[in-house]
Amino acid sequence: MELAPKEIFEQLLKWFVVPTFDLVIEIENTGFVLVKRKIEPYKNQWALPGLRMYKGESINESVARIAKQEVGLNIDVSKKILIGQYVGKFKTENQRQDLSTGYYLKISKGATVSINPNHFSKCNITYSIPGNTGAMYKYYLEKAIDLR
């Protein structure tokens, strides 16, 4: 799959909304997988694993890729539950705007999380929402807590 060069992608952010997926992954009886971001937007804040959709991917392919690429988990996407959408407007160089779709996924206890070190500095598996959590992620976590 060919991706736009970073310079071109950054320029497109000035005019286009980016479709993204964010995953509330609950490890059974343990907590939600939270990650501390190293990159913008939400740099140095607690977040959920998430990335943009690539051209040619189905929703299920995107969700599976994100779980594997961002936190090293192979998930059964057929059991995903739509929990909402969120429009993120960011004070970045190009005034980036994302249309995020959030999905809830529950996986078996004992799953091993392996974070993407290029994107995240830490992982926290908890049922609490840390104070330094990005607004979009807090919204999705609150929705997921209501589902439990």
Set out the residue ranges of the language-model regions.
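Acidic, metal-coordinating catalytic segment for phosphate/diphosphate chemistry
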Residues: 1-22, 28
